[in-house]
Every structure is written in structure tokens, then in C-alpha cells.
């Protein structure tokens, strides 16, 4: 077989095949380096003596009192011996060449799509409003205040209100926003008592959840102590603090609110194209009154992580989902119309695969709030 035929079969150039043959001439095939890099040693690679010293320090420092033997500790030790010690990256490469790295290299996987735990949001068929609090902002010579923030996932419609953290102060803000911008399909919250209601009683559905249900908005509560699902609103919280709180010195609550309103207006103007391309929002009536004793209708969604027995805790109760799904995320849809809870398995690696794990009977007592 000719060089040209081999090159065509393996998909490389003819010169590459010639170089391989030249390198293997008179040698065993398992001892030959067929890499495409230039032969020889890189000009900026650490010398063999320094590489040997790095390996020795790795072993010595591991047995030292501190027990710190990473690249930073090795470089600190080399600073006392060399005028120009190698960088952290060079030390790590030397350790890798000698097989002295005992940690497994972290596999970085692509992030799942926005709103991946809600199929309609992931497919951009529905909008999601994310709510959160920035707590304990100290006005100069004034009170401690909190900031209620909201950002829509697809349209980036933002709002921020300076207030005292309570359900009574939060409800009018939600109503005013939705009367102006329209109703989303979903509203997402963390598990704060202001949003979810009391945690120490069973079957409790708070006033904010009842507001959403009566407006046809599905409340979504993210899992406690989990990262990722609140990234959109937490990123906006950091942006607001950097661009408003840290840049200006407000002497009163009204002045801070005015500064915030000015920033929100500028932010909305900059993201107008995103809002126009976002999923449609339903109009809300200008005359709405919350009825806390009305029968619960619609769905309430809890994203939770199961325990070692495949159980989840929500609404002050414990539910068995699946023993084959321990320590994993599930989306629990509490359906008040059909008296059941549907539990779907969630995986960040495969966001489109959300199998139904269990359908649990559940009937809410529909007790009015006091």
C-alpha cells in the first residue's frame, strides 16, 4: 500500500504518513511517539533538575505538619531556593507528567438551558418571574431596609422595591408589576416564610401563593440550599448592589427608591428587545381583590431533592417518591383540581428527560387563612 493510499484511508496528509514512517524506522511501534508536535523539548519548559525538585517537595510537604502540598505550597518552598521559581501552572504540568496529581480532573459539562426544570419555560413557550430579597441594607443615619427584586427569565423585565420584608408589603408590589407588565405563566420564589408561608404547620398555602393561584400563575419554589435555579435573580441582585447601592449614598428610603427606579428604567430600556421577543404575558385586570378563603385551584410546584429513602418534604409533610431516585432532584406538581401530586425526575445532564416517578394522592383541607 502506498503512502498516498494510507493517508487517504486514515484522513491525514501524505507528508504526515511519511513523518510517521521516518519516526518508526528501526524502532518498536509501542515505543514511538506519533504526535504532531515538533520533536525535542519546549524552550520554556522547566529543567529536569527543577522538575525533580518539584517531585521531591511534593513528597516532603505531604508529610509535613501543615500537610499542604499543592502547587501554591511547592512554589512557596521554591522561592527560598530559586531566584525565578516556576509558575503554579508550570508546577502542575510537571506534577502531571510524573503522575503525582492525586486529584481527579473536574469534568466541566455545559450548563442546562434556562428554566430547564420547567419544560414550557425551557422551550421558551412560557415566561417565568423570579423573586428574591436583598436583606439588611443600612440607610445612613436611618433604618435597616430590605429590597424586593424581580427579573423575568426570558424578557429580563426587572423591578426593585425598598421595603420592610413582610407579606403585607410584598403583595402590592406583585400586583402592581403584573397589572403593568402582564401575568407570566410561572412565578419563582425561594422558601422564605414571606413567599411560601409558615413551614411548621401541615397543608399551609400562604397568601402569596394564593394570590398567584387566583391569578392563574403557577408558583414555583426552588429547593433549599441548591445552586443554579436562582442564578438569574441573584445575578441581578449583585448588579443592583454594584450599580445603585455602592455608587450612591442615599440618606432616606425615598431617595434610595428614586435612585433604584431610575436604574430600573435604564435597565429596561437596554433590554427592551429581549422583552419584545419573550413569551407573551396575559393582561391582568385593574380591579383585583385577593380572597384568602377561596377554594384552591390550579397547581403549586416544588422542586426538591429526595433523601436517602427517596422521600421529599413539602407542605409540612413527607412524601415517598421512589426508592430508586435517592438524593436526586424531583419536580413535585401539587394539583388541587385533581387532588394529586405528580413527581417528575430531573437531571441536569439530560434536561429533556423528565420521567414521571410517582402520582401521589393528596387532598388539601382548603382551610382559610387566619
Named regions from a protein language model:
Residues 1-25:
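Double-stranded DNA-binding cores of transcription factors and transposases
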Residues 6-7, 17-20, 54, 74, ...:
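Mobile genetic element proteins and their domesticated derivatives, centered on retroelements
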Residues 28-128, 279-287:
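Basic, flexible linker segments flanking DNA-binding modules
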Residues 48, 84-85, 95-151, 157, ...:
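Mobile-element integrase/transposase regions
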Residues 61-64, 81, 245-254:
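Short, polar/flexible loop-turn hinges at active-site or ligand-entry regions and domain interfaces
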Residues 66, 161-163, 197-202:
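Short, solvent-exposed loop/turn segments at secondary-structure boundaries
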Residues 189-190, 195-242, 253-256, 261:
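RNase H-like two-metal-ion nuclease catalytic core shared by retroviral integrases
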Residues 264-370:
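C-terminal, beta-rich DNA-binding module of retroviral/retroelements integrases
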Amino acid at each position: 500500500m502506498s503512502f498516498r493510499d494510507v493517508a487517504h484511508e486514515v484522513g491525514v496528509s501524505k507528508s504526515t504518513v511519511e513523518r510517521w514512517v521516518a519516526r518508526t524506522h528501526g524502532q518498536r511501534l509501542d515505543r514511538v511517539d506519533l504526535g504532531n508536535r515538533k520533536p525535542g523539548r519546549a524552550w520554556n519548559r522547566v529543567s529536569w533538575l527543577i522538575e525533580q525538585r518539584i517531585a521531591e517537595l511534593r513528597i516532603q510537604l505531604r508529610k509535613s505538619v501543615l500537610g499542604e502540598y499543592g502547587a501554591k505550597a511547592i512554589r512557596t518552598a521554591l522561592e527560598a531556593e530559586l531566584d525565578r521559581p516556576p509558575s503554579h501552572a508550570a508546577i502542575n504540568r510537571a506534577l502531571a507528567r510524573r503522575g503525582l496529581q492525586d486529584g481527579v480532573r473536574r469534568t466541566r459539562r455545559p450548563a442546562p438551558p434556562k428554566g430547564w426544570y420547567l419544560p414550557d419555560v425551557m422551550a421558551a413557550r412560557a415566561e417565568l418571574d423570579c423573586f428574591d430579597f436583598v436583606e439588611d441594607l443600612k440607610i445612613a443615619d436611618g433604618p435597616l431596609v430590605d429590597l424586593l427584586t424581580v427579573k423575568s427569565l426570558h424578557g429580563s423585565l426587572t423591578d426593585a422595591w425598598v421595603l420592610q420584608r413582610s407579606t403585607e408589603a410584598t403583595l402590592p408590589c406583585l400586583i402592581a408589576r403584573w397589572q403593568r407588565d402582564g401575568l407570566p405563566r410561572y412565578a419563582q420564589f425561594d422558601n422564605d416564610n414571606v413567599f411560601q408561608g409558615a413551614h411548621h404547620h401541615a397543608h399551609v398555602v400562604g397568601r402569596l401563593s394564593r394570590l398567584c393561584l387566583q391569578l392563574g400563575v403557577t408558583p414555583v419554589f426552588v429547593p433549599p440550599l441548591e445552586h443554579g435555579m436562582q442564578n438569574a435573580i441573584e445575578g441581578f441582585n449583585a448588579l443592583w448592589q454594584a450599580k445603585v447601592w455602592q455608587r450612591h449614598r442615599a440618606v432616606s428610603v425615598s431617595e434610595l427608591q428614586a435612585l433604584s427606579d431610575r436604574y430600573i428604567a435604564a435597565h429596561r430600556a437596554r433590554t427592551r428587545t429581549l422583552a419584545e421577543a419573550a413569551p407573551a404575558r396575559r393582561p391582568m385586570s385593574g380591579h383585583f381583590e385577593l380572597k384568602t378563603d377561596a377554594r384552591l385551584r390550579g397547581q403549586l410546584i416544588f422542586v426538591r431533592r429526595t433523601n436517602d429513602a427517596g422521600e421529599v418534604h413539602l407542605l409540612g409533610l413527607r412524601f415517598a417518591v421512589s426508592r430508586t431516585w435517592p438524593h436526586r432532584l424531583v419536580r413535585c406538581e401539587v394539583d388541587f383540581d385533581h387532588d394529586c401530586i405528580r413527581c417528575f425526575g430531573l437531571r441536569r445532564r439530560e434536561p429533556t428527560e423528565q420521567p414521571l416517578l410517582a402520582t401521589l394522592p393528596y387532598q388539601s383541607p382548603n382551610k382559610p387563612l387566619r
